[in-house]
Regions:
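Class I S-adenosyl-L-methionine
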Residues: 19-26, 48, 75, 79
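Local sequence-structure signature of Cys/Sec-based thiol-disulfide redox active-site neighborhoods
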Residues: 1-28
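Thiol-based oxidoreductase modules, predominantly thioredoxin-like and allied folds used
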Residues: 31-44
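Structural micro-motif
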Residues: 51-59
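Non-catalytic, surface beta->alpha helical segment in thiol-disulfide oxidoreductase systems
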Residues: 61-83
Length: 83
């Protein structure tokens, strides 16, 4: 895989699903960009514009949007995006 995409994780504090995803990201050693929707107005607006809600975690992988993905789903999306 060359020119690997960096996933963008939209999240918020106290989100148990976000903690689960971040745990998987850490185990896999992935580099991600994180954007806290409670502190980043642009991230919150992006989330509302792209999916029409503030459901987190939402991960952007290129043009693909993953809402509350498992680490397995995220890894599959990265493999597909980096083909």
């Amino acid at each position: 895989m060359t020119d690997a995409l960096t996933p963008v994780v939209l999240w918020r504090p106290h989100c148990p699903f976000c903690r689960i995803l971040f745990s998987g990201i850490e185990r896999q050693g992935l580099e991600v960009e994180t954007r806290n929707i409670w502190e980043d107005d642009d991230a919150r607006e992006l989330l509302n514009r792209r999916i029409g809600s503030e459901t987190v975690p939402t991960v952007l992988v290129g043009d693909e949007i993953l809402v509350n993905p498992s680490i397995t789903e995220l890894m599959a999306a990265l493999r597909e995006a980096n083909k």
